[in-house]
Regions:
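Conserved catalytic cores of phosphodiester-cleaving nucleases, focusing on short active-site segments
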Residues: 37, 65-89
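Short, charged, amphipathic alpha-helix that recurs within catalytic cores of restriction-modification
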Residues: 85, 91-121, 125-126, 130
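Short, flexible/disordered intra-domain loops and linkers
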Residues: 18-20, 54-62, 88-97
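Non-catalytic C-terminal interaction segments of nucleic acid-processing enzymes
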Residues: 1-9, 17, 21, 36-39, ...
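A structural signal for short, well-ordered beta-strand segments and their strand-loop junctions
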Residues: 45-46, 79-81, 116-120
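A short, highly charged nucleic-acid-interacting micro-segment common to nuclease
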Residues: 11-35, 56-57
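N-terminal targeting/trafficking signals and adjacent low-complexity tails
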Residues: 24, 47, 90-92, 159
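A short acidic/basic microdomain associated with nuclease active sites
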Residues: 34-62, 66-70
């Protein structure tokens, strides 16, 4: 039995790293974002459960942003909502939420009196005239204060102003997340 458990665990690890399933890709992106916060300066105060867990246990906390961090030197807190997308919509907009979710995040920010940032991962296929069958992707990341993400779908003029390097660690300064 131990052998089959190990095989199952190995398959899950492989699936986590290569799956295109939206739920798994979203979890992978959340983990990536979490790892961009240095444990020397940040601590996770709250983390929502995986969506599937919340659904199975009928939990309400998945309505909150994914993380609440504390910046250790000052004790300031802020929330992060992660979303991972693989395309723009037909109007060339980046859809990051629905209207109900946007409203919940706005209420959360107001009630908790802490800023909420929307961290969006966008992975788009690269097109090459030399290798038309090649599967390559370019990854983008955006860090948008909720006050600037006023609609569930954002125009390029909005989200392009908040681009950041995909692998660059986050830092906090004067109430702003960079």
């Amino acid at each position: 039995m131990d052998f089959w458990v190990k095989i199952g665990n190995a398959i899950q690890k492989i699936d986590y790293h290569i799956s295109h399933d939206p739920e798994i890709a979203g979890k992978r992106f959340e983990d990536h974002v979490r790892n961009l916060f240095s444990i020397k300066y940040f601590t996770v105060v709250e983390k929502t459960h995986f969506f599937k867990t919340n659904t199975e246990k009928n939990m309400d906390c998945s309505k909150n942003p994914d993380f609440i961090f504390e910046y250790i030197p000052t004790g300031e807190k802020f929330a992060i909502a992660c979303t991972y997308q693989t395309q723009l919509n037909n109007q060339n907009q980046l859809e990051w939420s629905n209207q109900a979710q946007l409203k919940r995040y706005q209420e959360f920010e107001y009630e908790r009196r802490i800023p909420v940032f929307i961290v969006i991962g966008l992975e788009l296929p690269l097109k090459s005239k030399y290798y038309p069958d090649a599967i390559a992707h370019e990854k983008f990341m955006f860090n948008i204060p909720l006050k600037n993400a006023t609609y569930p779908a954002l125009n390029r003029e909005v989200f392009a102003n908040f681009g950041r390097e995909y692998e660059r660690p986050f830092f906090w300064k004067n109430g702003k997340l960079y």
